[in-house]
């Protein structure tokens, strides 16, 4: 590995780490909105705590993907072709999660807000789980041919260890969100998050 490759590898690693550090509490707050928050005021307080920052944090993912594409195009191509289904589901989750913030805001009924809050929670659980599933699969290794194409099937990279990795990343994001809410909120919601964390 040359010095330039090492430099870009570190940059991509820092960008993905920044994404998981900054976006992790967003996912955790979304999870807490459907599990810890029990009434309308607590849900609004939880979601309002990430309102100004959630979309900015996703820029780290775009930058990491762009840096990976620019510096390691074969890695990028193998990743996207080999983990196509998981990345597609992550993209669907990111779309639903982003739309949820706007649709909750413009929903005029309590039932509509409740539905979009549940969509936010489900997407917030699914996205870190799928990222953990994918990264654990990458760490385990996936079969590739001589041209760098991934020859794995769905069951090759979705196994017991990768599911454990997905659950671990999901729980880590939830813990991150619980701690964030314990710092940024007050009243009963703060006490509940502090107790669970």
Per-region residue spans from a language model:
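Membrane-interface helix-loop-helix modules in multi-pass inner-membrane proteins
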Residues: 53-124, 145
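Helix-coil boundary and interhelical linker segments in multi-pass alpha-helical membrane proteins
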Residues: 1-12, 69-84, 136-162
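Membrane-water interface of transmembrane alpha-helices
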Residues: 22-32, 91-103, 171-181
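Membrane-helix interfacial "entry" motifs
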Residues: 1, 41, 48, 74-81, ...
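Long, contiguous internal "core" modules enriched in hydrophobic/ aromatic residues
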Residues: 103-197
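Alpha-helical transmembrane segments
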Residues: 8-19, 80-93, 121-125, 156-171
